[in-house]
Curated annotation (Swiss-Prot):
Span of domain DarT: 14-217
Top-tier EC class: transferase
Pfam families membership: DarT
Active site location: 57 (proton acceptor), 170
Descriptive protein name: DNA ADP-ribosyl transferase
Residues that bind NAD(+): 18-20, 57
Record note on what altering residue 170 to A does: Nearly complete loss of ssDNA ADP-ribosylation, not toxic in situ, no effect on DNA replication, no RecA induction. No ADP-ribosylation of gDNA in vivo
Length: 218
């Protein structure tokens, strides 16, 4: 199937996306998103990533901006259609398989992050690899391979072996992403949407919540 998400995934909008377990949302609404090295951590946080890769990222240095390591930042992708989301659905890559209903997608906007003077960096490939380039200026957003993101195409290509890593370019927000910088939540089903809206209502918070089952893998 051919996709074209160029209207929403582009350097002008600079939307950034993070997937989390649905049951982490109440804590996130109360505390925002905290980096791996933060002293503020949820007691019952449900991790959905690859534990081995999470461990490796802890000591990986960030060579620009505020510096530190990858665990000093809250990571986002520039697409909601990540290989990680597919691996969670399929159970590949050392990741626990989970139904789509358990996963929600948070959306923010890197231009809004910058406007609020929250420190950030971003990369043109998966942040863990040594050949990845890091940037601190929004003027460098054109270094991201937007066409493959817009086409939702992360198939490995023997003629372009770095394509898979470029698809996983990251936006990294220093230490803490407050809830005020989140623009909305995407979920798989109407049942989950109603639950998310209830959690927002209980906290007198207003945020867009949309059901987009077609954004998930099946």
């Amino acid at each position: 199937m051919a996709y074209d998400y160029s209207a929403s995934l582009n350097p002008q909008k600079a939307l950034i996306w993070r997937i989390v377990h649905r049951d982490n949302i109440p804590w996130i609404l109360d505390n925002g998103l905290h980096c791996g090295n933060s002293l503020v951590q949820a007691e019952n946080w449900i991790n959905i990533g690859n534990p081995e890769l999470i461990g490796k990222r802890a000591g990986h240095p960030v060579p620009v901006g505020t510096g530190g390591t990858l665990h000093d930042y809250v990571p986002f992708y520039f697409t909601p259609f990540s290989p990680m989301l597919m691996n969670i659905h399929s159970g590949r890559g050392g990741i626990k398989r989970r139904p789509n209903e358990e996963i929600v997608i948070l959306v923010s906007n890197l231009r809004n992050v910058a406007a609020h003077d929250v420190p950030f960096v971003f990369t043109d490939s998966h942040a863990y690899y040594n050949w990845t380039n890091y940037y601190t200026s929004l003027n460098s957003l054109d270094q991201i391979d937007w066409p493959i993101l817009q086409a939702r195409d992360f198939r490995r290509d023997p003629d372009d072996p770095a394509k898979f890593e470029r698809y996983q370019a990251e936006a990294l927000i220093w230490q803490h992403c407050p809830i005020s910088l989140l623009d909305g939540i995407i979920c798989y089903s109407e049942e989950v949407r109603l639950q998310l809206e209830q959690w927002l209502f209980q906290r007198n918070l207003t945020m867009s919540v949309h059901t987009r089952s077609g954004w998930y893998f099946s």
